[in-house]
From Swiss-Prot:
InterPro entries: Nict_dMeBzImd_PRibTrfase, Nict_dMeBzImd_PRibTrfase_bact, Nict_dMeBzImd_PRibTrfase_N, Nict_dMeBzImd_PRibTrfase_sf. GO terms for biological process: cobalamin biosynthetic process. Keywords: Cobalamin biosynthesis, Glycosyltransferase, Transferase. The active site is at E313. It comes from Mycobacterium leprae (strain TN). Catalyzes the synthesis of alpha-ribazole-5'-phosphate from nicotinate mononucleotide (NAMN) and 5,6-dimethylbenzimidazole (DMB). The lineage of its organism: Bacteria, Bacillati, Actinomycetota, Actinomycetes, Mycobacteriales. Its EC number is 2.4.2.21. This is Nicotinate-nucleotide--dimethylbenzimidazole phosphoribosyltransferase. One of its GO terms (molecular function) is nicotinate-nucleotide-dimethylbenzimidazole phosphoribosyltransferase activity. Belongs to the CobT family. Pathway: Nucleoside biosynthesis; alpha-ribazole biosynthesis; alpha-ribazole from 5,6-dimethylbenzimidazole: step 1/2.
Length: 351
């Protein structure tokens, strides 16, 4: 799989945003991380001050995983299709958060083990479910390529329709197990260091999940460091599509907010598919899954929020969008000392 080269965000716009921050009516650095985020947005948009986001778009990638049949989740596999329907009806957590964050939602069924809910939702569907990664490949070579291309196309479709910020989310029973394998493989971590309690599993289920990750890691070492091979062996169509989506967003110079463990695991692979992509991403939050912190550290991303969330769907990233909007608003709407006629136009006043 080949992606076009990723060019970095605009350094001149970043410098202009940093300089403007230092002239606003506040002590220098007083807005903390909000200042850093506003500079990042300006660099992604190539202008200072940056524009407020007009078309933030959430894409929830859905897929089932064969490993779920091994008792690694607190919920049955058929819940994935039911949750897709719930999001489509507007009744899920992501719907509530998207509404207040002024973002819209698209569901992409890549591998739900059921017929697509609609033609639009299933237009990029690759297959139903995936192989049990503890004992067999998740996908064939052809399915892996199709899933990555699907993610690329979804990113292109959204950017071509005017999306100025993308959020990647996930839904799928068993997907944190596949994500844990990818994170462990790409950070050289032991299974016990990356496996969390996911949907709220008990100790026995955690032990089964850890064993499944261990067995999958034995298989995945045969394909390291090939990113496409990793997705084929121990990913799934949803994770492969997420990787293609995250990489293509960077190729298209469109800022993207990562969500939790599953999306960040896919992003680790995306960075290997299209080096430099990470510059176009922010980590919306840090989840309670232990492997998530390892994945974020590997990408050198500092999470915007830490609210002990572990839901997925894009909820953590969508909550962070409100913070990102605040950062843009402050840089754009605040007056400078000179504009306000306030003393201290050369240097910021003491705090």
């Amino acid at each position: 799989m080949e992606f076009a080269p990723v060019s970095p965000p605009d350094g001149h716009a970043a410098a202009a945003a940093r300089a403007r921050q230092d002239t606003l009516t506040k002590p220098r650095g007083a807005l903390g991380r909000l200042e850093d985020l506003s500079i990042w947005v300006a660099s992604c948009q190539g202008q200072c001050p940056p524009r407020q986001f007009q078309r933030a778009r959430i894409v929830v990638f859905a897929g089932d995983h064969g490993v779920a049949r091994s008792g690694v989740s607190a919920y049955p596999p058929q819940l994935t299709a039911q949750m897709v329907a719930n999001i489509d009806r507007g009744g899920a957590a992501i719907n509530a958060l998207a509404s207040i964050a002024d973002a819209t939602i698209r569901i992409a069924d890549l591998a739900v083990d059921a017929d697509p809910l609609s033609q639009q939702i299933g237009i990029h569907k690759v297959r139903r479910g995936s192989g049990d990664i503890a004992i067999q490949d998740a996908l064939t070579e052809d399915e892996t390529a199709r899933a990555i291309i699907a993610g690329q196309r979804i990113a292109d479709e959204e950017v071509d329709r005017g999306a100025d910020l993308l959020i990647a989310g996930d839904i799928g029973i068993g997907n944190t197990t596949a994500a844990a394998v990818l994170v462990a493989a790409l950070t050289n971590a032991e299974p016990v260091a990356v496996v969390g309690f996911g949907t709220g599993i008990d100790d026995a289920s955690w032990a089964r999940k850890t064993a499944a990750v261990r067995d999958a890691l034995c298989r995945i070492r045969l394909v390291l460091p090939d990113p496409v091979g990793l997705l084929r062996c121990c990913g799934g169509a949803d994770l492969a599509a997420m990787a293609g989506f995250c990489a293509q967003a960077a190729v298209r110079r469109t800022p993207l907010l990562l969500d939790g463990m599953v999306v960040t695991a896919a992003a680790l692979v995306a960075e290997r598919l299209a080096p430099g992509s990470w510059q176009w991403w922010q980590a919306g939050h840090q989840s309670t899954e232990p492997g998530h912190a390892l994945a974020l550290a590997a990408l050198d991303l500092d999470p915007i929020l830490d609210l002990r969330m572990r839901l997925g769907e894009g909820t953590g990233a969508t909550a962070a969008l409100l913070v990102l909007r605040a950062a843009v608003a402050a840089l754009t709407s605040m007056t400078t000392f000179a504009e306000a006629g306030v003393a201290g136009t050369s240097t910021s006043p003491p705090s």
